């Protein structure tokens, strides 16, 4: 889920291959040296060494796409047209992109090509097609957030994450679907309808960034923006077989000028903006771009993107699963496979019990539910569907109702949980955990009953939602297919150590491969 206010809710693989350049200088926090070359030296003509990556343009990674455009191997216009063609070919059956921005995307692509022809500096994502989730402000457009009644909430300016992506030269080709108020783990709403999973229409694409996950998995855009307050980046990444990072709280700035009220404090402390992509290197590149300062977010933290490297082989804690969680054999096998990939990559993996995952999850559930009940519930229920009500009631049923004293005790308990995890990371810098222990549910399972909601959130994705209350970074990378459906694993690290999570994710990806390549064979 990714939550925002009821009146208007707002709700990275190691360094990429280095291109030859004597002037390529890695600034602090730099991660994509292939992309850095464009900032320092842009070629106005086609480079003698310009090469197009193999395969259709829409299948290229963001890193390769950016490099091809910089070198002149392809124009931004041709690139955007290829992605728009892909969108027209597959989106009608997926309903992942719900706002088509083809016209302005082509206009931006022409401008990008003119800018390159003039020479000079180019952004890290110059000419690269992306999508934005329809729950952050996009200047001049309603921020519907899945709710028809939000038609009058017109964005006065781009949200920080949109602005940062555009500043880097990215071209937005469409806005992706989200459930009402981005509050469900399943992507469906009365305004745009149900979004389908490109692997299998009988399983959910996840939520709330389900449109984002479905789109980028299917080849619509190279990077998809999303956000996460209870798993809304990591759950769709798992369901759609793509990679993501939920950054540390404060890493990426967030603000919606269309909102009529400020977000409650805990919503700030538990939520994060972030990217989904088919390649871990693309997630890392997008994280750098998205993380740039914006003065509108007082919670933004100027933390370096790369921290000190741990001494010796990195110890990974393979999280022991609580006894009350029924682990599907395919999930258990995927976790063992991921652990083996890490071991073969030089990590040292041990099965260890992590600090009080059950207590952490319950603290998350209690805080987010009670804050919503006080600040937003009444207004939300007036403008939402019966499906929303059913899903919300299921979550409420698992939460403890808190009075003021109990609320203060819960927020204090949060500090203790964070401290315990930070101390744990001193011994084990990386935690390998499941995204879910259960098979991926159906596309509308949270509307069946309150019990089914609890089965999904408490019984299935407990290790996802719990991390939000800790404010920790969590990456997801796909590991395997079971009966044609993707299974991902989660990598959790200390505060502002997204680099460690993404390094581990890249090590797994290097051995597991990019699952989306197998998806396309079945779609076309």
UniProtKB/Swiss-Prot annotation:
Keyword Secreted (UniProt): no
EC number(s) from the headed UniProt entry: 3.5.1.-
An annotated Gene Ontology molecular function: hydrolase activity
Basic residues bias spans: 1-26, 34-54
Catalytic EC class: hydrolase
GO biological process: auxin biosynthetic process
Superkingdom of origin: Bacteria
Record region (Disordered): 1-56
One Pfam family, short name: Amidase
Coiled coil, from the record: none
Name of the featured protein: Indoleacetamide hydrolase
Keywords (A to Z) from UniProt: Auxin biosynthesis, Hydrolase
Name of encoding gene: bam
Summary of the function given for this chain in its UniProt record: Hydrolyzes indole-3-acetamide (IAM) into indole-3-acetic acid (IAA).
Catalytic site positions: 133 (charge relay system), 208 (charge relay system), 232 (acyl-ester intermediate)
Pathway(s) this gene product operates in, as recorded in its UniProt entry: Plant hormone metabolism; auxin biosynthesis
Sequence similarity: Belongs to the amidase family.
PANTHER family: GLUTAMYL-TRNA(GLN) AMIDOTRANSFERASE SUBUNIT A, MITOCHONDRIAL, TRANSAMIDASE
């Amino acid at each position: 889920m990714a939550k925002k206010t009821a009146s208007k809710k707002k709700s990275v693989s190691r360094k990429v291959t280095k291109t030859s350049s004597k002037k390529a200088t890695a600034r602090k926090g730099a991660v994509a040296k292939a992309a850095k070359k464009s900032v320092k030296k842009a070629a106005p003509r086609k480079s003698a060494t310009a090469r197009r990556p193999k395969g259709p343009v829409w299948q290229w990674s963001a890193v390769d796409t950016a490099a091809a455009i910089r070198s002149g191997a392809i124009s931004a216009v041709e690139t955007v047209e290829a992605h728009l063609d892909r969108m027209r070919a597959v989106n009608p059956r997926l309903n992942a992109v719900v706002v088509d921005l083809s016209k302005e995307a082509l206009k931006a692509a022409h401008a990008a090509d003119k800018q390159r022809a003039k020479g000079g500096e180019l952004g890290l994502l110059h000419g690269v097609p992306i999508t934005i989730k329809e729950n952050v402000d996009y200047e001049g457009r309603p921020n519907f957030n899945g709710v028809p009644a939000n038609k009058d909430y017109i964005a006065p300016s781009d949200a920080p994450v949109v602005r940062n992506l555009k500043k880097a030269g990215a071209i937005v080709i469409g806005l992706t679907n989200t459930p009402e108020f981005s509050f469900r783990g399943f992507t469906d709403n009365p305004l745009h309808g149900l979004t389908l999973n490109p692997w299998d229409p009988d399983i959910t694409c996840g939520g709330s960034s389900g449109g984002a996950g479905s789109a980028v998995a299917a080849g619509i855009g190279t990077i998809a923006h999303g956000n996460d307050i209870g798993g809304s980046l990591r759950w769709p990444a798992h369901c759609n077989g793509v990679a993501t990072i939920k950054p540390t709280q404060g890493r990426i700035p967030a603000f919606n000028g269309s909102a009529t009220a400020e977000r409650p404090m805990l919503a700030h402390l538990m939520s994060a903006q972030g990217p989904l992509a088919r390649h871990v290197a693309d997630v890392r590149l997008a994280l750098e771009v998205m993380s740039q300062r914006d003065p509108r977010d007082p919670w933004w933290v100027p933390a370096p993107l790369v921290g000190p490297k741990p001494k010796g082989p990195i110890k990974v804690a393979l999280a022991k699963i609580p006894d009350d969680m029924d682990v599907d054999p395919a999930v258990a096998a995927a976790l063992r496979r991921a652990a083996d990939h890490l071991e073969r990559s030089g990590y040292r993996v041990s099965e260890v019990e992590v600090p009080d995952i059950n207590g952490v999850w319950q603290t998350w559930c209690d805080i987010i539910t009670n804050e919503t009940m006080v600040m937003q519930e009444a207004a939300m229920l007036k403008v939402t569907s019966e499906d929303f009500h059913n899903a919300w009631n299921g979550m409420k049923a698992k939460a403890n109702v808190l009075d003021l004293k109990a609320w203060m005790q819960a927020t204090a308990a949060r500090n203790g949980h964070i401290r315990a995890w930070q101390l744990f990371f001193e011994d084990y810098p990386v935690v390998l955990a499941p995204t879910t222990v259960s098979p991926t549910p159906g596309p509308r399972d949270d509307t069946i009953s309150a019990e089914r909601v609890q089965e999904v959130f408490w019984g299935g994705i407990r290790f996802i939602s719990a991390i939000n209350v800790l404010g920790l970074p969590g990456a997801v990378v796909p590991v395997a297919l079971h009966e044609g459906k993707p299974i991902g694993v989660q990598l959790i690290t200390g505060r502002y150590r997204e680099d460690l999570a993404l390094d581990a994710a890249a090590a797994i990806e290097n051995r597991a491969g990019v699952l989306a390549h197998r998806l396309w064979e079945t779609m076309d």
